[in-house]
Amino acid sequence: MHTPVPRLHRFPGRPALLAALLPLALACSQTRDTSHDACPPEAPALATGGAPHALKTVFVIVMENQDWSDVAGSPSAPYVNGTLLPAFAHALDYRTGGLHPSLGNYVWLEAGDPLGIHFDAPPADVPLPVTCHLATYLEDVGLTWKAYAEGISGDTCPLVNEGKYAVRHDPFVYFEDVSGRPFDPHSARCIAHVRPFEELASDLAAGTVPRYAFIVPDVCDDGHDACPPLNDPVGQQDAFLAREVPAIMDSAAYRDGGVILIVWDEGHRGDHPIGLIAVSPLAKPGYAAPGAYTHGSTVRTVQEILGVTPLLRTAATSASLSDLFTAYP
């Protein structure tokens, strides 16, 4: 005789059980792997010896969520294709290993590794006790840095989304040595270094721009969202770059060994190549670098230009972007 198999929906407690398990499942999906948190045994130091560096000041601008094939040759990006690519160098094979979504990629650009983050969350949900990351390395050896973020007031440490400011695109505030333990919106270190984007122009004009400047556009200018009047993420990115890159290029900091690294955080289809453009008086004009690169390459390049050791995590095993320049570092 056939005995019917009971169906789950016949159990009256099933909805309550699912409701109880859902928070646990979400918590597990947002648990980061801490196995890469360890710091190198060496203390941060400035490299000594050798010739003076040709490259001296680094600006990083991060764009959002486009494969390179969506940007290269696109009629929505006339500034990138008609001005930047003919005059400067770019990478053909820059990838993130298929890492999604945003936060892990931004942390990678600061710490040399995603630090086990494969989800988006505010700092309160993913505090990073790690002390070996670029900002702290630079301060430890006496070099200056700032993040310039659109849409923040500068009166507090911007630990939550606000208007068009996305906190997940601002990696510095996730580190407890920057934002406090527990996180503190009044953290003096954070407020001193994470500044409104508008201050970049005055710092450039006054000659007080830091040696390392990380630029955080809002979710319209970085192309994360489709925003009016263009309603075209690639077009929005291009318009922002066309407006802001020339302003940086007009500064003494750029003319005297400056480099602007324009990088996309991730693609939107698996692990296809994403964009990396090196804008500098010392970039190879019109050059398309064939090498394989990652966010670890960007971190390595920043460290080598600024002369800061030891190399952070994947920066130690990634190729630098030296091939994109006529003189390096």
Give the positions of each predicted feature.
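N-terminal secretory signal peptides that target proteins for export/translocation
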Residues: 1-12
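N-terminal pro-sequences and low-complexity stem/linker regions of secreted or lumenal proteins
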Residues: 30, 36-329
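C-terminal motif of bacterial Sec signal peptides marking the signal peptidase cleavage site
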Residues: 25-27
